Amino acid sequence: ALLGPGERGEIVVRGSLVTPGYYRDRQATAEASRFGWHHTGDIGYLDDDGYLFIVDRAKDMVITGGFNVYSTEVEQALMQHPGVRDCAVVGLPDEKWGERVVAVVQAQPGTDLREAEVIAFVKTLIGSVKTPKQVHLWPDLPRSKVGKVLKTDIKATLGAAR
């Protein structure tokens, strides 16, 4: 169903310029192509003028206590802290809440960054539900060959450390 302005949902597209499928990957094609529409895996919304805004990847969204928390929103709040050089936000399993928001932060050189300080800072910007419950300080974030942060590696590392 088409959502109203400002309502967030998965972006789906169709047309002559949309891929007919993933190269040699029938399963991914079947998952993305449903009812003649290509499901992008992106969450977004249309504004009142019909402009499309991408909010996050659906797979990066954290569902905690019934609330949808977009990792990009939390990352943008973290990046406002002067001691944060880079960051990534993931969801980890939580018995009570389903998932909990967890951040991995790379500090600015020469900064003595503390977990409690970062959590308190973010809480003032986006509220307690979206604020990371844990902040891990890492010297570097894992990246792909093209420089993209590998959130799957972060989740695997943090999940294995439990």
Language-model features and meaning:
Residues 25-28:
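Active-site loops of AMP-binding adenylate-forming
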Residues 36:
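FAD-site-proximal beta/loop scaffold in flavoenzymes
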Residues 159-162:
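Flexible coil/turn and secondary-structure edge motifs
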Residues 4, 10, 15, 20-21, ...:
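AMP-binding/adenylate-forming catalytic core of the ANL superfamily
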